[in-house]
Design a protein with these regions (language model features):
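Conserved loop->alpha-helix
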Residues: 1-196
Length: 196
């Protein structure tokens, strides 16, 4: 589990079929082989540690569900270590299991903030609630608007500076994870027998 609060921006050193090598520093502190690190919101297992980075294996299913297959050397990625029971949850509970990708539609300045609008599939939008949480490329954000095919979030200055979200361009794909509580409640209600 993660919190959606990005600890560090890493840089892709190598992106090969089935493996990523990422330059990083902060997320290496206290990290051991086999530990989880979220890369753009995707829970990956650390398979090899170096002084200035780590290796992670990527399964074919992960490539199908996420934007990790589009990464190239030099790309900047959001990184977060798995949470511990002793830390604050500054964002919301994030599994690191990407359900679908969405597409950046637009950025609109609003004071010091930027309103980011994303196109998303119905499978995600059914669990998106205005004022509820959503995870975009691993970043915990609050939904401020929703339409039949998109939603919007506000990126404050800190988020603009400490994540890779404003480095994206319209048309770029992002990893989406809906709120785990909304998803579980929704699925339980869908599976409930009719009339009960």
């Amino acid at each position: 589990m993660f919190t959606g609060i990005i600890e560090e921006l890493g840089t892709v050193r190598e992106a090969e079929e089935g493996r990523l090598i990422i330059n990083a520093a902060k997320v290496l502190w206290g990290t051991n082989l086999g530990d989880s690190i979220a890369v753009n919101g995707v829970d990956l297992t650390c398979t090899y540690l170096e002084e200035d980075g780590f290796h992670a294996s990527v399964m074919p299913e992960t490539y199908r569900r996420t934007n990790l297959g589009e990464l190239r050397p030099g790309d900047v990625v959001n990184l977060e270590r798995a949470m511990t029971l002793a830390q604050r949850i500054g964002g919301h509970l994030v599994r690191g299991v990407i359900e679908h990708t969405g597409t950046l539609e637009s950025f609109t300045p609003e004071g010091d903030a930027i309103i980011a609008r994303y196109q998303a599939p119905p499978e995600i939008l059914r669990y998106v609630v205005v004022k509820g949480p959503i995870t975009i490329d691993g970043v915990s954000l609050t939904v401020i608007d929703k339409t039949s095919d998109s939603f919007a979030v506000s990126l404050v200055e800190f988020t603009q500076e400490h994540t890779n979200l404003t480095r994206k361009r319209p048309g770029d794909r992002v990893n989406l994870e809906s709120d785990i509580i909304a998803r579980y409640v929704g699925q339980l209600l869908e599976e409930r027998p009719a009339g009960k």
